[in-house]
């Protein structure tokens, strides 16, 4: 599917065996791909030591997440005071709510434990969710493009590249407007398909449900496509505030 990705130039240890045993069953039932995409250890936020108050707060929150059923596929919870303040933000893809979101949480939690051991700030992206653990209080969140990266399908469009790019941008703008209409503000998500000659274009846009300017984030991401992914048959732009993707094959649950 994807053989390469590029990071934008602007661009835990959680010893809870019970959580992992509880969640592993739901992970195995996930039929669609949930590949690891990228991660970032936020070294500027420092690290915590085993047994300190930050670790206690982190373990409390990771257990607390299990009490949610994720009807909209999103959670932003926090606990404690600086320097032991912890926030967890989990945003699942719009078609991955309820138990499917919990499955992605288990995968992401395990992934962060391996890749960013004891970092207070860290984020990881998978096909179906991103998990952001943070030690800085910020709610609602402003758009921050430092933790953004892009990926693209290795295959290029052979003909009518400019027309394909234009129609793709236009379709993404349509979905952006749909996702940000007043009756969709709880999900901030839209997906669809559009016929392009003999082909079909599949696309989705989504914002995390705690950001101030969803439309501004998606507009910025759509503009990034011309820099990273010109003429590509598929691409994504992912961050901690919003994400978008398009392909010439279906990649979402119906």
Swiss-Prot record:
Predominant location: secreted
Domain of life: Eukaryota
Location of this chain's protein in the cell: Secreted
A Pfam family assignment: Stress-antifung
Keyword Signal: yes
CC annotations in GO: extracellular region
Keyword Signal: yes
Keywords for the protein's UniProt record, in alphabetical order: Repeat, Secreted, Signal
Annotated ranges, domain Gnk2-homologous: 36-138, 145-251
Classification via PANTHER family: CYSTEINE-RICH REPEAT SECRETORY PROTEIN 29-RELATED, CYSTEINE-RICH REPEAT SECRETORY PROTEIN 38-RELATED
Family membership noted in the UniProt record: Belongs to the cysteine-rich repeat secretory protein family.
Record-given protein name: Putative cysteine-rich repeat secretory protein 37
Biological source species: Arabidopsis thaliana (Mouse-ear cress)
């Amino acid at each position: 599917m994807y053989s390469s990705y590029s990071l934008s130039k602007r661009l835990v240890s959680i010893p809870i065996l019970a959580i992992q045993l509880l969640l592993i069953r739901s992970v195995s039932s996930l039929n669609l791909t949930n590949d690891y995409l990228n991660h970032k250890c936020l070294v500027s936020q420092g690290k915590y030591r085993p047994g300190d108050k930050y670790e206690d707060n982190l373990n409390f929150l990771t257990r607390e997440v299990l009490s949610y059923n994720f009807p909209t596929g999103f959670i932003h919870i926090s606990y404690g005071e600086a320097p032991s303040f912890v926030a967890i933000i989990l945003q699942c893809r719009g078609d991955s709510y309820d138990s499917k979101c919990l499955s992605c949480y288990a995968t992401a939690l395990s992934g962060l434990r391996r890749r960013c051991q004891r970092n207070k700030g860290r984020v990881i992206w998978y096909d179906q969710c991103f998990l952001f653990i943070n030690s800085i209080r910020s709610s609602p969140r402003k758009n921050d493009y430092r933790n953004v990266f892009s990926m693209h399908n290795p295959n290029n469009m052979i003909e009518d590249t400019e027309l394909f790019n234009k129609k793709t941008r236009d379709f993404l703008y349509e979905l952006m407007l749909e996702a940000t209409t007043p009756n969709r503000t709880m999900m901030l998500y839209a997906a669809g398909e559009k016929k392009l000659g003999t082909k079909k274009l599949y696309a989705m846009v989504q914002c995390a449900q705690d950001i101030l300017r969803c439309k501004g984030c998606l507009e910025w991401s759509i503009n990034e496509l011309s820099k990273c992914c010109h003429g590509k048959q598929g691409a994504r732009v992912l961050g901690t505030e919003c994400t978008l993707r398009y392909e010439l094959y279906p990649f979402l649950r119906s």
